[in-house]
Amino acid sequence: MKILVTAFDPFGGEKINPALEAVKQLENTIGEHTISKLEIPTVFHESKDVIDKELANGNYDVVLSIGQAGGRYDLTPERVGINIDDARIPDNKGNQPIDVAIQEDGAPAYFSNLPVKTMTEAIKAAGVPASLSNTAGTFVCNHVLYQLGYLADKSYPGLLFGFIHVPFIPEQVTDKPEKPSMSIETIAKGLTAAIKAISKEDDAKVALGETH
């Protein structure tokens, strides 16, 4: 399949975004998939517009967005994006929507139609910590995951879409001793395993849920 992999520019005062740096390391062919890479701005709505423009020109089967989740220790494929922006910090253009619907005519939520459990298990099988996440937050990462579902629903029928959060890298936590980190190389290894696992097959039926 032809897969578009996107990653954000640095945000929140960080000088580097591990998602972007790891995506840069991905091979152009992973398994049976052809990979294209796209940097997107950490900006509400503009991020979606950049992806939409590329999708309109690219005839992609899949779009997989990668984002930073500082504080998480593992790679976390996301199950769902919700129709709300509630920004604790401004985006890279100073926008800070609070309790604003992303799309007035959109669904309350869009679930990733990728095999997220299979992908999570594949990351772990590659020796990289991973868990399935049921919340992508309410900042631009959730915004993009939701917008991907909206685009698939309204404009690109049959498009497969999803999102994976990645941890900080060591360079980002020299002044944050309480925060976990992971090397760019390990993040890229995990992303490669996840991408290899992408297919149109039914997802794995394994218990990866949370009790709270």
Curated annotation (Swiss-Prot):
This is Pyrrolidone-carboxylate peptidase. Its EC number is 3.4.19.3. It comes from Staphylococcus haemolyticus (strain JCSC1435). HAMAP family: Pyrrolid_peptidase. The lineage of its organism: Bacteria, Bacillati, Bacillota, Bacilli, Bacillales. The gene is pcp. It catalyses: Release of an N-terminal pyroglutamyl group from a polypeptide, the second amino acid generally not being Pro. It comes from the Bacteria. It is an enzyme of class 3 (hydrolase). Keywords: Cytoplasm, Hydrolase, Protease, Thiol protease.
